[in-house]
Amino acid sequence: MSLEEKEFKHISVLLQETIDSLNIKPDGIYVDGTLGGGGHAYEVLKRLSPKGRYIGIDQDEDAIAAAGKRLSEFSDQVTIVRSNYCNMKQVLKDLGIDKVDGILLDLGVSSYQLDTPERGFSYRENAPLDMRMDNRNSLTARDIVNEYSEQEIYRIIRDYGEDKFAKNIAKHIVRMRSEKPLETTDELTEAIKAAIPMKIRMNTGHPAKKTFQAIRIELNHELEVLTNTLEDMIDLLKEDGRLSIITFHSLEDRIVKAAFRKNENPCVCPPNFPVCVCNRKPKGIHITKKPILPSEQELEYNKRSKSAKLRVFEKHE
């Protein structure tokens, strides 16, 4: 299947909810930090006037190519940049943009990445262990699995996969690689399966899911990038501008929720102080105290939306 066909079949999660959450101004400037195939971008662009601008950022070469084709009818308004969204501030500075009306992040791995076996993201298809979102980087999942210490692998699976069998999985990975390096997704999956009791494997989801997630997060620095970039993104918003973020697991959601709460209520004074003396000012409002979840209808036609959560922050100074 070609890249175009795969991207055509990709379904953007929480599409209408995300578009609504951005409160789009027709003449506004919007930034997509995880452009992907351009599904969300297309819907935003349809709502912009000829004066509106859209900047799409993605580190994945295939995503850049697919989005460029999908958004070609808006070429006068769209700027696509191959980069990580952690560089958003610099990307906008290079374009002469100081503030924007809205920012969107759709985190995690894309359907295209999962459905392209040779990318090595999926435990359902045998392929070389890769998992790089940006193939310009030299480090791959194979390097992590074969070169990290047992303690490091345990830490990754425990912290980023939240798997209670993390210690045993790390032990089995190291044991199997001592016989021969683990080269493929199937070989890694076999090591994981061997570490988890059959009774547990029969009654839960795929045993490799959490470990694959953990290795991918470690390799691509996903949580580190998110944590270190949230403040910059809020600062880039104009008054009334909105930051909308779709997360797919609790680790991401906790980081976003904490950052939004902190920027809504930044005061660190003890509760018994009569007045604030820390002088930390709120930057806006976390307008989704409870995250927006996929509808029953969306869950039916897009199973991958099951764990998605949308949170929105509105800038006020």
Swiss-Prot record:
Compartment(s) of residence: Cytoplasm
Lineage: Bacteria, Bacillati, Bacillota, Clostridia, Lachnospirales
Lineage top rank: taxon: Bacteria
Stated name of the protein: Ribosomal RNA small subunit methyltransferase H 2
Enzyme Commission code(s) on record: 2.1.1.199
Residues given in the record as S-adenosyl-L-methionine binding sites: 38-40, 58, 85, 106, 113
Its job: Specifically methylates the N4 position of cytidine in position 1402 (C1402) of 16S rRNA.
Gene Ontology CC: one annotated term: cytoplasm
Protein family (similarity comment): Belongs to the methyltransferase superfamily. RsmH family.
Gene3D superfamilies per the UniProt record, alphabetical: Putative methyltransferase TM0872, insert domain, Vaccinia Virus protein VP39
